[in-house]
Protein backbone atom coordinates (compact mmCIF):
# COMPACT_ATOMS: atom_id res chain seq x y z
CA UNK A 1 0.00 0.00 0.00
CA UNK A 2 2.90 2.33 0.73
CA UNK A 3 5.27 1.06 -1.98
CA UNK A 4 4.54 3.98 -4.32
CA UNK A 5 5.06 6.70 -1.71
CA UNK A 6 7.61 9.36 -2.52
CA UNK A 7 10.44 9.86 -0.03
CA UNK A 8 8.84 13.12 1.12
CA UNK A 9 5.48 11.41 1.74
CA UNK A 10 7.11 8.47 3.49
CA UNK A 11 9.05 10.75 5.83
CA UNK A 12 5.87 12.71 6.62
CA UNK A 13 4.04 9.49 7.44
CA UNK A 14 6.88 8.23 9.65
CA UNK A 15 6.89 11.53 11.56
CA UNK A 16 3.13 11.22 11.99
CA UNK A 17 3.50 7.56 13.01
CA UNK A 18 5.88 8.06 15.92
CA UNK A 19 7.60 11.00 17.64
CA UNK A 20 10.93 9.14 17.40
CA UNK A 21 11.01 10.33 13.76
CA UNK A 22 10.23 13.98 14.60
CA UNK A 23 13.69 15.16 13.48
CA UNK A 24 13.88 12.90 10.40
CA UNK A 25 14.91 14.77 7.25
CA UNK A 26 15.21 13.83 3.59
CA UNK A 27 19.01 13.98 3.90
CA UNK A 28 19.07 11.61 6.89
CA UNK A 29 16.68 9.17 5.20
CA UNK A 30 18.87 9.25 2.10
CA UNK A 31 21.93 8.32 4.18
CA UNK A 32 19.98 5.37 5.63
CA UNK A 33 19.05 4.15 2.14
CA UNK A 34 22.65 4.42 0.90
CA UNK A 35 23.99 2.64 3.98
CA UNK A 36 26.12 5.64 4.94
CA UNK A 37 24.36 5.89 8.31
CA UNK A 38 22.13 3.54 10.25
CA UNK A 39 19.04 4.34 12.35
CA UNK A 40 18.88 3.21 15.96
CA UNK A 41 17.55 -0.27 16.75
CA UNK A 42 14.36 1.33 18.09
CA UNK A 43 13.80 3.20 14.82
CA UNK A 44 14.49 0.06 12.78
CA UNK A 45 11.82 -1.85 14.71
CA UNK A 46 9.43 1.09 14.34
CA UNK A 47 9.91 1.03 10.57
CA UNK A 48 9.18 -2.72 10.53
CA UNK A 49 5.97 -2.08 12.51
CA UNK A 50 5.09 0.85 10.25
CA UNK A 51 5.16 -1.42 7.19
CA UNK A 52 3.41 -4.18 9.19
CA UNK A 53 6.29 -6.56 8.46
CA UNK A 54 7.40 -9.54 10.53
CA UNK A 55 9.44 -8.29 13.50
CA UNK A 56 10.76 -11.76 14.35
CA UNK A 57 12.22 -12.26 10.86
CA UNK A 58 13.77 -8.79 11.01
CA UNK A 59 15.45 -9.34 14.41
CA UNK A 60 16.60 -12.88 13.51
CA UNK A 61 18.03 -12.00 10.12
CA UNK A 62 19.41 -8.49 10.61
CA UNK A 63 22.93 -7.93 11.85
CA UNK A 64 22.67 -5.81 14.99
CA UNK A 65 25.76 -4.76 16.92
CA UNK A 66 24.88 -6.03 20.38
CA UNK A 67 26.51 -4.35 23.37
CA UNK A 68 28.00 -6.72 25.95
CA UNK A 69 27.46 -4.02 28.57
CA UNK A 70 23.74 -3.83 27.76
CA UNK A 71 23.42 -7.61 27.79
CA UNK A 72 25.06 -7.68 31.22
CA UNK A 73 22.61 -5.00 32.39
CA UNK A 74 19.70 -7.17 31.20
CA UNK A 75 21.17 -10.30 32.82
CA UNK A 76 21.63 -8.43 36.11
CA UNK A 77 18.02 -7.28 35.83
CA UNK A 78 16.89 -10.88 35.37
CA UNK A 79 18.95 -12.05 38.34
CA UNK A 80 17.00 -9.58 40.49
CA UNK A 81 13.75 -10.89 39.04
CA UNK A 82 14.74 -14.44 39.95
CA UNK A 83 15.67 -13.33 43.46
CA UNK A 84 12.31 -11.58 43.88
CA UNK A 85 10.58 -14.64 42.45
CA UNK A 86 12.34 -16.96 44.88
CA UNK A 87 11.22 -14.74 47.75
CA UNK A 88 7.62 -14.64 46.47
CA UNK A 89 7.60 -18.41 45.94
CA UNK A 90 8.36 -18.99 49.61
CA UNK A 91 5.72 -16.54 50.84
CA UNK A 92 2.92 -16.79 48.26
CA UNK A 93 -0.24 -18.80 48.53
CA UNK A 94 0.24 -22.56 48.17
CA UNK A 95 3.95 -21.94 48.78
CA UNK A 96 4.18 -25.08 50.90
CA UNK A 97 3.94 -27.19 47.73
CA UNK A 98 7.18 -26.45 45.90
CA UNK A 99 7.34 -29.63 43.81
CA UNK A 100 6.45 -30.08 40.16
CA UNK A 101 4.51 -27.25 38.50
CA UNK A 102 2.61 -26.70 35.27
CA UNK A 103 1.54 -23.56 33.43
CA UNK A 104 -1.79 -23.16 31.64
CA UNK A 105 -2.77 -20.28 29.37
CA UNK A 106 -6.44 -19.35 29.21
CA UNK A 107 -7.25 -17.44 26.02
CA UNK A 108 -9.92 -17.26 23.30
CA UNK A 109 -9.38 -20.94 22.43
CA UNK A 110 -9.14 -22.22 26.01
CA UNK A 111 -11.37 -19.86 27.99
CA UNK A 112 -11.08 -19.68 31.75
CA UNK A 113 -14.79 -19.99 32.55
CA UNK A 114 -15.08 -23.27 30.63
CA UNK A 115 -11.92 -24.79 32.07
CA UNK A 116 -11.60 -23.57 35.66
CA UNK A 117 -13.99 -23.77 38.59
CA UNK A 118 -15.76 -20.70 39.96
CA UNK A 119 -13.86 -20.57 43.26
CA UNK A 120 -10.47 -20.58 41.52
CA UNK A 121 -11.59 -17.82 39.13
CA UNK A 122 -12.83 -15.75 42.08
CA UNK A 123 -9.47 -16.19 43.78
CA UNK A 124 -7.61 -14.97 40.69
CA UNK A 125 -9.97 -12.03 40.23
CA UNK A 126 -9.82 -10.93 43.86
CA UNK A 127 -6.03 -11.06 43.82
CA UNK A 128 -5.76 -8.93 40.66
CA UNK A 129 -8.18 -6.36 42.05
CA UNK A 130 -6.40 -6.31 45.41
CA UNK A 131 -2.99 -5.75 43.79
CA UNK A 132 -4.42 -2.75 41.90
CA UNK A 133 -6.07 -1.33 45.01
CA UNK A 134 -9.55 -1.58 43.47
CA UNK A 135 -12.94 -2.44 44.89
CA UNK A 136 -14.64 -5.79 44.31
CA UNK A 137 -17.07 -4.05 41.95
CA UNK A 138 -14.19 -3.95 39.45
CA UNK A 139 -14.22 -7.76 39.10
CA UNK A 140 -15.52 -8.93 35.73
CA UNK A 141 -18.68 -10.98 35.57
CA UNK A 142 -18.56 -14.39 33.85
CA UNK A 143 -20.26 -12.93 30.75
CA UNK A 144 -17.82 -10.00 30.60
CA UNK A 145 -14.83 -12.34 31.00
CA UNK A 146 -16.07 -14.62 28.23
CA UNK A 147 -16.83 -11.68 25.93
CA UNK A 148 -13.34 -10.20 26.38
CA UNK A 149 -11.64 -13.60 26.11
CA UNK A 150 -13.43 -14.69 22.95
CA UNK A 151 -12.44 -11.41 21.30
CA UNK A 152 -8.76 -12.18 22.08
CA UNK A 153 -8.41 -9.22 24.44
CA UNK A 154 -8.08 -11.00 27.80
CA UNK A 155 -5.55 -13.70 28.71
CA UNK A 156 -4.86 -15.48 31.99
CA UNK A 157 -1.57 -17.25 32.66
CA UNK A 158 -1.79 -19.58 35.68
CA UNK A 159 1.02 -21.49 37.41
CA UNK A 160 -0.22 -24.62 39.19
CA UNK A 161 1.58 -26.77 41.74
CA UNK A 162 1.47 -30.56 41.76
CA UNK A 163 -1.77 -30.57 43.79
CA UNK A 164 -3.51 -28.27 41.27
CA UNK A 165 -3.23 -25.32 43.66
CA UNK A 166 -2.58 -21.90 42.09
CA UNK A 167 1.00 -20.89 42.82
CA UNK A 168 1.23 -17.73 40.68
CA UNK A 169 -0.66 -16.04 37.86
CA UNK A 170 -0.64 -13.08 35.51
CA UNK A 171 -3.63 -11.41 33.83
CA UNK A 172 -3.19 -9.48 30.57
CA UNK A 173 -5.72 -7.34 28.74
CA UNK A 174 -5.65 -5.32 25.51
CA UNK A 175 -7.16 -1.82 25.47
CA UNK A 176 -7.74 0.79 22.79
CA UNK A 177 -4.91 3.26 22.31
CA UNK A 178 -7.47 6.07 22.43
CA UNK A 179 -8.50 5.02 25.97
CA UNK A 180 -5.03 5.52 27.45
CA UNK A 181 -5.63 8.83 29.25
CA UNK A 182 -8.98 7.66 30.64
CA UNK A 183 -7.34 4.42 31.79
CA UNK A 184 -4.56 6.26 33.65
CA UNK A 185 -6.99 8.68 35.31
CA UNK A 186 -9.24 5.85 36.51
CA UNK A 187 -6.17 4.03 37.80
CA UNK A 188 -5.04 7.06 39.79
CA UNK A 189 -8.50 7.27 41.37
CA UNK A 190 -8.67 3.49 42.02
CA UNK A 191 -11.85 3.27 39.93
CA UNK A 192 -10.77 1.06 37.01
CA UNK A 193 -13.68 -1.02 35.71
CA UNK A 194 -14.29 -2.80 32.42
CA UNK A 195 -17.59 -1.00 31.74
CA UNK A 196 -15.62 2.21 31.09
CA UNK A 197 -13.88 0.67 28.07
CA UNK A 198 -14.78 -0.81 24.74
CA UNK A 199 -12.80 -3.75 23.36
CA UNK A 200 -10.25 -2.84 20.67
CA UNK A 201 -11.23 -3.93 17.18
CA UNK A 202 -8.98 -6.16 15.08
CA UNK A 203 -7.48 -3.18 13.19
CA UNK A 204 -7.23 -0.72 16.09
CA UNK A 205 -3.99 0.36 17.81
CA UNK A 206 -3.89 -0.76 21.42
CA UNK A 207 -1.77 -1.27 24.54
CA UNK A 208 -1.33 -4.37 26.66
CA UNK A 209 -1.97 -4.07 30.39
CA UNK A 210 -0.21 -6.52 32.72
CA UNK A 211 -2.40 -6.25 35.80
CA UNK A 212 0.28 -7.01 38.37
CA UNK A 213 3.96 -7.80 37.88
CA UNK A 214 4.53 -10.74 40.24
CA UNK A 215 7.48 -13.11 39.84
CA UNK A 216 7.98 -16.67 41.07
CA UNK A 217 10.30 -19.50 40.02
CA UNK A 218 12.80 -19.23 37.16
CA UNK A 219 10.47 -21.39 35.03
CA UNK A 220 7.57 -18.97 35.57
CA UNK A 221 9.66 -15.81 35.07
CA UNK A 222 11.04 -17.04 31.75
CA UNK A 223 7.62 -18.23 30.61
CA UNK A 224 6.10 -14.78 31.24
CA UNK A 225 8.89 -13.01 29.32
CA UNK A 226 8.68 -15.54 26.46
CA UNK A 227 4.91 -15.05 26.17
CA UNK A 228 5.25 -11.27 26.24
CA UNK A 229 8.01 -11.29 23.61
CA UNK A 230 5.97 -13.55 21.30
CA UNK A 231 2.81 -11.47 21.78
CA UNK A 232 4.66 -8.27 20.84
CA UNK A 233 6.35 -9.93 17.86
CA UNK A 234 3.02 -11.19 16.53
CA UNK A 235 0.88 -8.12 17.03
CA UNK A 236 2.00 -4.87 15.41
CA UNK A 237 -1.10 -3.11 16.77
CA UNK A 238 0.30 -3.13 20.33
CA UNK A 239 2.16 0.15 20.82
CA UNK A 240 3.20 -0.10 24.45
CA UNK A 241 3.13 -2.15 27.63
CA UNK A 242 1.44 -0.88 30.77
CA UNK A 243 2.08 -2.59 34.08
CA UNK A 244 1.67 -1.91 37.78
CA UNK A 245 4.19 -2.61 40.53
CA UNK A 246 4.74 -1.75 44.18
CA UNK A 247 8.46 -2.57 44.02
CA UNK A 248 11.00 0.26 44.46
CA UNK A 249 13.34 1.12 41.58
CA UNK A 250 16.38 -0.47 43.24
CA UNK A 251 14.57 -3.84 43.11
CA UNK A 252 12.81 -3.46 39.76
CA UNK A 253 14.41 -0.85 37.49
CA UNK A 254 12.23 -0.75 34.39
CA UNK A 255 13.50 2.72 33.52
CA UNK A 256 17.19 2.13 32.88
CA UNK A 257 16.58 -1.29 31.27
CA UNK A 258 13.51 -0.58 29.09
CA UNK A 259 13.14 3.23 29.39
CA UNK A 260 9.94 2.70 31.37
CA UNK A 261 8.04 5.85 32.32
CA UNK A 262 5.91 6.23 35.46
CA UNK A 263 2.58 7.61 34.19
CA UNK A 264 0.57 7.31 37.39
CA UNK A 265 0.70 6.27 41.02
CA UNK A 266 -1.78 5.69 43.80
CA UNK A 267 -1.98 4.37 47.35
CA UNK A 268 -3.24 0.84 47.69
CA UNK A 269 -5.32 0.66 50.87
CA UNK A 270 -6.29 -3.00 50.39
CA UNK A 271 -3.45 -4.25 52.61
CA UNK A 272 -3.03 -3.95 56.41
CA UNK A 273 -0.45 -1.26 55.67
CA UNK A 274 -1.02 0.94 52.61
CA UNK A 275 1.54 0.65 49.81
CA UNK A 276 2.31 2.91 46.88
CA UNK A 277 1.79 1.30 43.49
CA UNK A 278 3.05 2.74 40.22
CA UNK A 279 1.73 2.47 36.69
CA UNK A 280 4.63 2.14 34.25
CA UNK A 281 4.53 2.54 30.47
CA UNK A 282 7.11 0.89 28.18
CA UNK A 283 7.18 1.46 24.42
CA UNK A 284 7.17 -1.84 22.53
CA UNK A 285 10.20 -0.75 20.49
CA UNK A 286 12.18 0.00 23.66
CA UNK A 287 11.32 -3.46 25.00
CA UNK A 288 12.07 -5.42 21.82
CA UNK A 289 15.05 -3.16 21.07
CA UNK A 290 16.72 -4.01 24.37
CA UNK A 291 19.94 -5.85 23.53
CA UNK A 292 19.19 -8.56 26.09
CA UNK A 293 15.81 -9.20 24.45
CA UNK A 294 17.38 -9.16 20.96
CA UNK A 295 19.99 -11.66 22.14
CA UNK A 296 17.21 -13.82 23.64
CA UNK A 297 15.29 -13.80 20.34
CA UNK A 298 18.36 -14.58 18.23
CA UNK A 299 19.32 -17.49 20.52
CA UNK A 300 15.86 -18.99 21.03
CA UNK A 301 14.07 -18.46 17.71
CA UNK A 302 16.75 -19.38 15.16
CA UNK A 303 14.68 -22.11 13.52
CA UNK A 304 11.21 -21.03 14.61
CA UNK A 305 8.57 -18.90 12.95
CA UNK A 306 5.84 -16.86 14.62
CA UNK A 307 2.79 -15.99 12.56
CA UNK A 308 1.56 -12.42 12.83
CA UNK A 309 -1.96 -11.70 13.96
CA UNK A 310 -4.22 -10.46 11.17
Describe each model-derived feature in a short phrase:
Residues 3, 146-160, 178-180:
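A short helix-loop-beta-strand connector motif used in the catalytic cores of GNAT acetyltransferases and
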Residues 40-60:
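DNA major-groove recognition helix of helix-turn-helix/homeodomain DNA-binding modules
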Residues 1-19:
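Short basic helix-loop element that most often maps to the first helix and adjoining turn
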Residues 152-173, 184-188:
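Conserved beta-hairpin
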Residues 15-39:
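Recognition helix of helix-turn-helix/homeodomain-like DNA-binding domains
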Residues 79-144:
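Short amphipathic alpha-helix that is part of the acyltransferase structural core
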Residues 182-265:
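Acyl-donor binding region in acyl/amide transferases
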Residues 59-92, 310:
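Short, charged recognition helix plus adjacent turn
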Amino acid sequence: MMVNLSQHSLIDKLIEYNEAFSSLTLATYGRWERGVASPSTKKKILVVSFFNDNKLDFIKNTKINISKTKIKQFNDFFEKIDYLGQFNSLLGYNSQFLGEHKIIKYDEVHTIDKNLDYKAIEKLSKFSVKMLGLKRTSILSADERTDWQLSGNLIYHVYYNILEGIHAHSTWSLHRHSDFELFVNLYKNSTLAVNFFGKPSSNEDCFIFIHALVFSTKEWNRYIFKELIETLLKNNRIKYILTSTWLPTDLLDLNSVFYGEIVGSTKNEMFPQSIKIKLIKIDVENFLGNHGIINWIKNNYKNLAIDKYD
